[in-house]
Amino acid sequence: MASEQPVEAAPTGGSLADRITKPDESNTSETPAPIGDQTDGAPAQLGGSDLHEPEYNVEVKLSDLQADPNNPLYSVKNFEDLGLDPRILKGLSSMNFRKPSKIQERALPLLLNNPPKNLVGQSQSGTGKTAAFVLNALSRVDLSTEQMQKTPQALILAPTRELARQILGVVQVMGQFVDGLIIGAAVPTDRDSRPKRLECSIVVGTPGTVGDMIKRRTFIPNKLKVLVLDEADNMLDQQGLGDQCIRVKALLPRDIQVVLFSATFPEHVHQYASKFAPNANEITLQHEELTVEGIKQLYLDCADGEDKYRTLVQLYGLLTVGSSIIFVQTRAAAQEIERRMTAEGHTVVSLTGERDPSVRDAIIDQFRRGEAKVLIATNVLARGIDVSTVSMVINYDIPELHQPNVPGRQADFQTYLHRIGRTGRFGRVGVSISFVSNREEWEMLNQIQTYFNCEIQRVDTKDWDEVEDIIKKTIKNSRANPKFAGGKD
C-alpha cells in the first residue's frame, strides 16, 4: 500500500542532507510556532499522546573518540538551524513541534551530518525518537525525479504490523507537504492477497515481510540509504526477530546508514547492536532517569485461574472509565476470555498475532477511536503502541521468559516495562494491575519489584468498594506519584 501527498513543489538536486552543512538562508521557514504540545508516537490525528519532557540528561558517546561530544556542532536548539526543507518544517509544525526535544537536540545533528554515520539511541517512549528518525528519513530521500520518487531509499522496520502502521502515520503527517513523496507499507497481508511491487521513496514494514519481498523482487533495495530499527532490543534479540533482521540487512547496500532506537537495551543486545551498527554514535538517557512516570502499580491476590477470571469480570466497570488493555500470555487465553466475557454481555475485543491483518487493523483502529474500550492482547501490543486514552493495564498473566534449561519461572522485566508503559503515557496518569494466583506468580512479581527497586501495592479483593476507590482516585489524580525506577541494564 502506497500513499502519495500531492502538494507544492519541493527543491530539486539531490537529498536535503547533502545541503545541511551549507543551508540556503532563503529556505528558512516562516511558519509561526504553533500552540500546544509536541507529539511523538502516534500523531494527534491518529489518537496519539503528547510529548512528555521529564527532567533528564542525554549522554552522547561519539564513534570518533577524538571528538568532543559537547561541541556545539553536535547540538541544536531550533529546527531552523538544521537547514531543513520548509515543507518538512511545515509538517513538524502541523504535529505541534515548536522546538527539538532534548533527545532531538543531540540526535538530529548526528543523524543529519554528512557523511552519514550510524546511530544507536536508547530513549523512552514520548521523548521524540520517532519524529527524529522519521525526519532523518525524509531528509535523506532524493525526490528530484519521478523515477527516484518511486525508488525505495529509506526503510523503517518495526516488530509488529500495528507499530509499523503507527510509524507510517507519522511519516504521512510529517511529510504531508513534501511534493513527490510516496510512502509504502511492507507488512503482512491477508492470505488471499499478493504483495505488489513497492514503488515508493520510504518503506515502513516488518522484517519478515520485507525479507520475503526482497527475495521475490517486489522490493528492490539497491538504492536504500537509511535503515531504521524501532524497538531495536526486540528486533535484535536472538529470541525475537534477530535472524530476520540479519537476513534483511545482508541484502541491503553495505554503506547504508543504520539507526537503532529502543527504550531498553539489555547488555547482551547492546553488544550485538554495536556489530549490527558498527562505529555508531550513541545517545543514551542517563541510567537513573529511565522511568515510567504517573503509573500506580497494584496487584491482586486470586485463589486460582478461575478466580482470576471472576476478578477480571468484577473489574469490568472500572476498565471502561477510560480505555484498558488486558495482557495475557497466549492466544488461546485471549480468545477464551473474549468468548466468556462477550457471552456474559460485556463488550471486549481481542488482538492476537494469528488474526488476518485486515482484522487486526480494524480492531486497533476501533480501539483508537474509543469504539472498543477494553482490548485483550498478547505481547503483540506491548511495544511502542501509543493510544492516548489508555488509563489501565491488566497483567492477567505476569510476563515471563521461557528458559527450558533454567529451573523455576523467570519474569520478563523488559516486557513488563513495555506493557505498563501503554498507560500513563507522556505525563498522563495510569494504573497497572497484576493478577497473582499461585506461589510461582508471586515469586515473579517479587522478581519485578527487586529488579526495578519499586513497590507494587497489594489491593484487598474482599472489599471491592476499596478497590474501586483506590483505582478511581488514582485515575482522577492529576499528580500521581511516580514510583517506577530505572532497572539494571
UniProtKB/Swiss-Prot annotation:
GO cellular component: cellular bud tip; cytoplasmic stress granule; nuclear membrane; nuclear pore cytoplasmic filaments; nucleus
Subunit details: Associates with the nuclear pore complex.
A GO biological process held by the record: poly(A)+ mRNA export from nucleus
EC number, as in UniProt: 3.6.4.13
Location of the Helicase ATP-binding domain: 110-283
Annotated disulfide bonds: none
Major location category of this protein: cytoplasm
Location of this chain's protein in the cell: Cytoplasm; Nucleus, Nuclear pore complex; Nucleus membrane
SUPFAM superfamilies associated with the record: P-loop containing nucleoside triphosphate hydrolases
Domain Helicase C-terminal: 311-467
Catalyzed reactions: ATP + H2O = ADP + phosphate + H(+)
Motif, Q motif: chain positions: 77-105
Motif residue range(s): DEAD box: 230-233
Annotated residues for binding of ATP: S123, Q124, S125, G126, T127, G128, K129, T130
Keywords on record: ATP-binding, Cytoplasm, Helicase, Hydrolase, Membrane, mRNA transport, Nuclear pore complex, Nucleotide-binding, Nucleus, Protein transport, RNA-binding, Translocation, Transport
Broad EC category: hydrolase
Function: ATP-dependent RNA helicase associated with the nuclear pore complex and essential for mRNA export from the nucleus. May participate in a terminal step of mRNA export through the removal of proteins that accompany mRNA through the nucleopore complex. May also be involved in early transcription.
Similarity-based family: Belongs to the DEAD box helicase family. DDX19/DBP5 subfamily.
Region (Disordered): 1-51
Name of the protein described by the UniProt record: ATP-dependent RNA helicase dbp5
Entry remark concerning the domains of this protein: The Q motif is unique to and characteristic of the DEAD box family of RNA helicases and controls ATP binding and hydrolysis.
